[in-house]
Amino acid sequence: MTTFTAKSETVQRDWYLVDAAGKTLGRLSTELARRLRGKHKPVYTPHVDTGDYLVVINAEKIVVTGNKLKDKKYHRFTGYIGNLKTESLEQALQRHPERVIEIAVKGMLPKGPLGRTMYRKLKVYSGAEHPHAAQQPQVLDI
């Protein structure tokens, strides 16, 4: 008997639609990262991308607990001296709400080429509309 190893060309990848309205940021992000990796499947193999495609809608309606809206900070550096930009979660949700979920999920995925291919299967939209109707995503309740 040999150990089963999934092959990336034979993995069945499904499309799922997730509504983020009223969901907690961290709890939603962990489940999204788990499904992007494919850990929910019996054919999960750590070195093969076995995850599904995820379409997240209503990213602007995400909620956080405690004082994180004011206390949580996002930093980015432009590359120029003295240009470390900092914004709170509240400001980030106003400017680009989809990026908040993307950053949270990306930090939970592996760092490297495999993690980047997993991350590309995540599609986040701030409103209720998305351009992936042709893929017929199944509604996933998280």
Swiss-Prot record:
Belongs to the universal ribosomal protein uL13 family. Keywords: Ribonucleoprotein, Ribosomal protein. Coiled coil: none annotated. GO terms for molecular function: mRNA binding; structural constituent of ribosome. One of its GO terms (cellular component) is cytosolic large ribosomal subunit. This protein is one of the early assembly proteins of the 50S ribosomal subunit, although it is not seen to bind rRNA by itself. It is important during the early stages of 50S assembly. One of its GO terms (biological process) is translation. InterPro entries: Ribosomal_uL13 (IPR005822), Ribosomal_uL13_bac-type (IPR005823), Ribosomal_uL13_CS (IPR023563), Ribosomal_uL13_sf (IPR036899). Part of the 50S ribosomal subunit. The keyword Transcription does not apply. Pfam families: Ribosomal_L13 (PF00572). This is Large ribosomal subunit protein uL13. It comes from the Bacteria. Gene3D superfamilies: Ribosomal protein L13. PANTHER family: LARGE RIBOSOMAL SUBUNIT PROTEIN UL13M (PTHR11545:SF2), RIBOSOMAL PROTEIN L13 (PTHR11545).
